[in-house]
Amino acid sequence: MTLELLKLTDEYVQYKFFPEDDKSNFGIVQVDVKEPAKRFVVQDAKNVSGMYKGMAMVRVSLLVKNGEFPQTSACAWC
């Protein structure tokens, strides 16, 4: 799955997530930059496992905790 930075403000960050790297089907997750545990799905990807949105929220929360806001990021199933 790939992530692409969509929006970064003083309050939150939003990333698009692309399950299976399919650019035609994406979701959007938002994470609070001060409290990374505050996170939710703005838009869900269609016809894919809900695990993708969970993985996207966890990955973006980890980036926020590390103070990292890359333009793109990737994560794989462990």
Predicted regions mapped to residue ranges:
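Acidic, low-complexity intrinsically disordered segments
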Residues: 28-78
